[in-house]
A protein has these predicted regions:
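Structural and coupling elements of P-loop NTPases
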Residues: 1-534
Length: 534
């Protein structure tokens, strides 16, 4: 198979949702149908020892939530599928933002009983900024659900995107019997003995809409209701336009139940048919697009994770390949460091499990062993003409705490742990301007990240900490030249604090919006930004 053929069979997408909409369960079932696992785990975890394959950190298994992005790969119907399973919990949204930079499309999972929720709105906005296709999977149809027409209207009104139902549900709750495929015009009736509890593939029966046998399969009432709803749907629904889908203007909608597997395989088949091959990325130096099928290799680092497996006390840099081919042992130019480095070993990751990768192509996500040379947003490339992809923005934290270790004899472990976790982008570390690590201020997007920080320092670095919450709510990066602009000359409120990050960038911490406005109105030449570059 040629490089172009390998690249064109890649499909790389992220799954996003509000917490508890069933995102990780859907990921598990896609792996089940893709043959990557023989039996699906269960994020419920109360009746058995199973946990979701994509939840690899102990705290994820204990809490039943995803706090880091997982990368999962499988082959299905000739396609090589890369899934980026992202944290649903709002406190870990920054990791999700970074992960969406590596995706070519997104699957938005919505709870059929609740419709669009707050976190879904935030993540949807990030997808629209990147103009990537957004597919919708309306989940939990096996429970009591809102009317399907109402759910479609809910998506369009709140998110401002047109929808097109690719299939239509037959009943809901205990009466959820299957879906009608609008492309093939066939009814797919699902059956399960109920004992497998969704851990194995579900049986399907295919029939024409007018087939009298559907009265027995569905009940006469559900059969007639389906006929009436399809007639109404065909009369009012917008025409399907793949170009609009690829521009992120029209969202194909699928109904199903990830827990029972109803509708999962039809979704997977249609999604892989419609979702794009690896997208061209923009070279920030020239503004030109980088063709994924070109011979020269290029990639960027979008995530760093330490201590992924207790058997491997190492750091892995997650790399999205944008063009060309990766080969184990190849040399690539590290743009930010300005030197060639050897990519000795690439790994394919299935949660905490890993396998050596000899070759990979544009669209693939692989892990690189990181001895401390990579940062989030770094570009790697080969060829005479160097490329550089845009840096990944870092978001302003909303919660701050002063951190110190309880045992002063463990200072070395404390500093190492804090720096490594910060390099992953999980936290941001600030210190007094010109100071060291004596007094460390940590900034996070959500308070649960502070709990995870304390847990990881204790379990991974054997360090216990004291934590004092601080009253700051806002952070701004100072854009003025540090050589000519002295922060001590600024007119600020008494509770505003000047700090610097680990790269020496200067920042101001504020306790309120009012304090931010004071700084902006009383210092005409002061330039502040809500975003910095990692």
């Amino acid at each position: 198979m040629t490089n172009r053929e390998e690249i064109e069979r890649r499909r790389t997408f992220a799954i996003i949702s509000h917490p508890d909409a069933g995102k990780t369960t859907l990921t598990e079932k896609l792996l089940l149908y893709g043959g990557a696992i023989n039996q699906a785990g269960s994020v419920k975890g109360k009746q058995s020892a199973k946990h979701a394959v994509s939840d690899w950190m102990d705290i994820e298994k204990q809490r039943g939530i995803s706090v880091t992005s997982s990368v999962l790969q499988f082959n299905y119907a000739g396609k090589c599928v890369n899934i980026l399973d992202t944290p649903g919990h709002q406190d870990f949204s920054e990791d999700t933002y970074r992960t969406l930079m590596a995706a070519d499309s997104a699957v938005m999972v919505i709870d059929a009983a609740k419709g669009v929720e707050a976190q879904t709105i935030k993540l949807f906005k990030v997808c629209t900024l990147r103009h990537i296709p957004i597919f919708t999977f309306i989940n939990k149809m096996d429970r009591e659900a809102r009317d399907p027409f109402e759910l479609m209207e809910n998506i369009e009104e709140i998110l401002g995107i047109k929808t097109y139902p690719m299939n239509w549900p037959i009943g809901c709750g205990k009466e959820f019997k299957g879906v009608f495929d609008r492309n093939t015009r066939k009814v797919l009736a699902f059956s399960s003995d109920g004992r497998a509890n969704g851990v194995k593939k579900v049986d399907e029966t295919e029939a024409e809409l007018g087939d009298p046998a559907l009265d027995e399969l569905l009940t006469p009432y559900l059969h007639q209701q389906l006929v009436d709803e399809i007639e109404l749907l065909d009369g009012v629904a917008e025409e399907f336009d793949l170009d609009k889908v690829l521009r992120g203007e029209l969202s194909p909608v699928f109904f199903g139940s990830a827990l029972t597997n109803f509708g999962v395989e039809p979704f997977l088949e249609n999604f892989l048919r419609l979702t794009p091959t690896p997208l061209a990325r923009v070279d920030s130096l020239t503004g030109e697009t980088v063709d994924p099928c070109r011979d020269e290799f290029s990639a960027f680092i979008f995530k760093i994770q330490a201590y992924m497996n207790k058997a491997h006390r190492d750091r892995i840099a997650f790399m999205r390949i944008c063009s060309g081919k990766f080969e184990r042992g190849m040399e690539a130019f590290h743009v930010q460091e300005g030197k060639n480095i050897k990519l000795a070993t690439g790994t394919q990751l299935m949660a905490q499990d890993r396998a050596i990768v000899d070759e990979a192509y544009a669209g693939d996500i692989i892990g690189l062993f990181d001895p401390g040379i990579f940062s989030i947003g770094d570009t790697l490339c080969t060829g005479k003409k160097k490329v550089q992809f845009a840096g990944i923005p870092t978001f302003s934290p909303e919660h701050f705490a002063r951190i110190e270790q309880k045992d002063t004899m463990k200072r070395k472990q404390f500093v190492k742990g804090m720096e490594q976790i910060a390099q992953e982008g999980a936290i941001q570390i600030f210190r007094e301007v010109g100071g060291g690590m004596e007094e460390v201020v940590v900034g996070v997007v959500g308070v649960l990240q502070l709990e995870v920080l304390e847990y990881r320092l204790n379990t991974e670095y054997n360090v216990e900490i004291r934590m004092q919450q601080l009253p700051f709510e806002q952070l701004r990066w100072v854009q003025n030249d540090p050589d000519t602009y002295n922060l001590r000359d600024l007119d600020l409120t008494s509770d505003t604090k000047a700090v610097e990050d680990m790269k020496g960038n200067r920042l101001l911490l504020f306790t309120s919006d009012w304090a931010v406005r004071w700084a902006e109105t009383h210092n005409e030449t002061l330039k502040l930004s809500e975003f910095g570059n990692i």
